[in-house]
C-alpha cells in the first residue's frame, strides 16, 4: 500500500461522507478491538463536524485513523488515557488523537520530519502510511510529543467544496 500511495498507483474510491457519523463508526470499531481494553478513551466530536462533508475514500481514511489509535495503545506499557477530538471550520476537518503515554521516540519524529534515516532507522511504517493516506486526500498531518509526556497526532482534511463533491 505504501508504495502504491507514494507513486499514485492506489486509486482513491472517493465518496461523499458525513464526517460525524463516519468518525463515530471508526471510534466505535476501535472500542470493540481488544486493544481498547488497555486504555480509557475520551471522544469529542463538535456539532460543526455533524454537518461537515468529506470527499474521501472511507476505507483508507479508516485505516489511517485506526493506525494512530492502535499505535497509541500498542507502543505504551500499561493503561493509557487516549483522547480523540474532531472539529471543523468552513473548509477543514481538524482531528487530534493524543495519549498520555511515553510519546514518540525522537528518532521516529526525526524520520517523520524528513531527516535522513540512519543505519538503525526506526520502524515507522504505520505512521508513514497515515501520512500518505492523509496527503492523498489533500490533507496534512503532524506528529509531536506532548509536555510533560504523551504523543499527539494532528490531522487536517479538506471538506467538500461544492455540490459536485457533496
Where would I find each of the regions flagged by the language model?
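Short alpha-helical Gxxx[C/S/T] motif in the catalytic ATP-binding
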Residues: 126, 130
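Conserved micro-motifs of the catalytic ATP-binding
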Residues: 7-12, 53-56
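Short conserved segments within the C-terminal catalytic ATPase subdomain
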Residues: 8, 33-45
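Short helix-loop "hinge" at the ATP-lid/N-box region of the Bergerat-fold HATPase_c
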Residues: 71-73
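A conserved beta-strand-to-alpha-helix junction within the catalytic ATP-binding
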Residues: 13-28
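Short beta-strand/loop element within the Bergerat-fold HATPase_c
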Residues: 79-91
